Amino acid sequence: MGKLTILVLVAAVLLSTQVMVQGDRDQPADRDAVPRDDKPGGTSGKFMNVLRRSGCPWDPWCG
């Protein structure tokens, strides 16, 4: 039983070390990247734009 506990602990240490090493890679392109807004109006703005083009039946809410 003691050997099994040691084996499980060693496996856990190896896995956590592997995760730390993989997550520690330097990614300069991501670090210096400027976030861009692909949808300037946002999701609701896009939805409202579709409603305006298709003829919105709810005039008070369509703007």
Swiss-Prot record:
GO terms for cellular component: extracellular region. It comes from the Eukaryota. Keywords: Amidation, D-amino acid, Disulfide bond, Hydroxylation, Ion channel impairing toxin, Neurotoxin, Secreted, Signal, Toxin. Residues 22-52 are annotated as: Disordered. Pfam families: Conotoxin. Disulfide bonds join C56-C62. The modification D-tryptophan is found at W58. The modification 4-hydroxyproline is found at P57. The keyword Disulfide bond applies. Residues 1-23 form the signal peptide. GO terms for molecular function: ion channel inhibitor activity; toxin activity. Transmembrane segments: none annotated. Belongs to the O2 superfamily. Contryphan family. Its target is unknown, but this toxin may modulate voltage-activated calcium channels (Cav) or calcium-dependent potassium channels (KCa). The cysteine framework is C-C. This is Contryphan-Mi. It comes from Conus miles.
